[in-house]
Amino acid sequence: MSKEVNEERTPRTVEDVKEMLTKHSNGEIQRTIQNCITILQNDHVLADAIRLNLLSERIDIVKPVGWPRSGKTLNDTDMKYILRRMEKYGISSEKKIESAIRIVANENRYHPIRDYLNSLKWDGTERIPHVLYHFLGAAEDEYTCEAMKIFLLGAIKRVFQPGCKFETMLCLVGGQGAGKSTFFRLLAVKDEWFSDDLRRLDDDNVYRKLQGHWIIEMSEMIATANAKSIEEIKSFLSKQKETYKVPYETHPADRLRQCVFAGTTNRQDFLPRDRTGNRRFIPIPVDAELAEVHILDDETESRTYIGQLWAEAMTIYNRGDYKLAFSPAMQETLQAHQQDFMQEDAQAGMIYAFLEDYTGDRVCSKQLYAEALGNTNIPAEWETRSICEIMNTGISRGDIQGWQAHKTAKRYPKYGVQKGWERVTSPETGAEDFSEITDAEAKQLGFPF
């Protein structure tokens, strides 16, 4: 680990630093990387200025260096000034100076969010159960409290343990102007740690848009997703790292995720009807009219409140008595909330209605495709797979009662050999219309489930 860059240094003149450098026998300063490092560490302008930011994975200049600049990140103009400074020592090899800068920065690495979180002192007042009501008018109940706690602790853990498993998205649902996006921006503490620039997941630069950010808002992205894109979003949220190379690198490297994702939407039916589960998305309805304050009424006070919110979360994190998931009982509450925000599943409704009036003992996916959904063509594989998901999920959730999946495939008069579903207590009548086939035959036919 690097020595503390804040330790007291005796200011050294250029002549003092020259005395520290290795020289040729004729007294000329050697143009080595090590001499460049010595200059960068001891020159009164450059000493303690160059550090590697572990959040952005970029090199920062963290103190005034005597030339006009904006922002912290080292840029091309900074390099020109540094090269000019190094010429005072008779060194002008840009390649060696750049190598020395990377070494010095790496030995003086820091993480701005870790430093911020570790500096906080909690005043002992609980804010996690109340913050979403305070600023956004959300319900003050156990579900909202647990959702907020999971999100905060997930964000903290991602910073201290980059790449940890955390695939939960807190989704704020409410009218325009409620302050949803502003809440997440202020929650990120610094605007540079927040981003709402992630619009497409198929963008070649999508992973670079995560770099240097802590909280990333995905506004309306879920609400506009189709069946294919929602799977892409779920897969994207589940990733723990990205692999790519930045311009100065020769080889790609793994970048462990340090960010979390937040959703905002105005739509009440923003969740797609996902029959395999929407566990990653935690919807929280908000109502600005019920909020105690609008988050921008007094931004300074709001930021102070949020600072104490993080201090409270850090206290919980340091104790270690937390989980980044709902309890089984609260998971049921989550599923009930998700149902309130799900889009209508027309196909499932048609199949459920068909089964209510159906008098037969067995059905298969092709039969439901034709008779329940009214299609006359031969279904594609993905269409039969979708019907299988409707049936199997409906049975497991109790939406479809009195039915169970076949243990073996059976031959249907109109539809051939199919796997399907049968009534749990079926009479013997009509059984002669079906005949069982072996598991080998079923495997050979390649059924969708």
Task: State each model region's role.
Residues T304-H337:
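Long, low-complexity, charged/polar intrinsically disordered regions in eukaryotic proteins
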Residues I215-L237, P272-G277:
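Conserved AAA+/SF3 P-loop NTPase catalytic/coupling segment centered on the Walker-B
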Residues I230-A253:
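Conserved catalytic/switch belt of AAA+ P-loop NTPases
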Residues L324-F449:
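DNA transaction DNA-binding modules
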Residues V206-Q211, V246-T264:
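AAA+/SF3 P-loop NTPase mechanochemical coupling elements
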Residues M1-R127, E142, E146, N377-W382, ...:
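N-terminal nucleic-acid engagement/recognition segments and initiation subdomains in replication
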Residues I101-Q211, K366:
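P-loop NTPase catalytic core of nucleic-acid-dependent motor ATPases
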Residues L271-E292:
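A short helix-turn-beta junction within AAA+ P-loop NTPase domains corresponding to the substrate/partner-engaging
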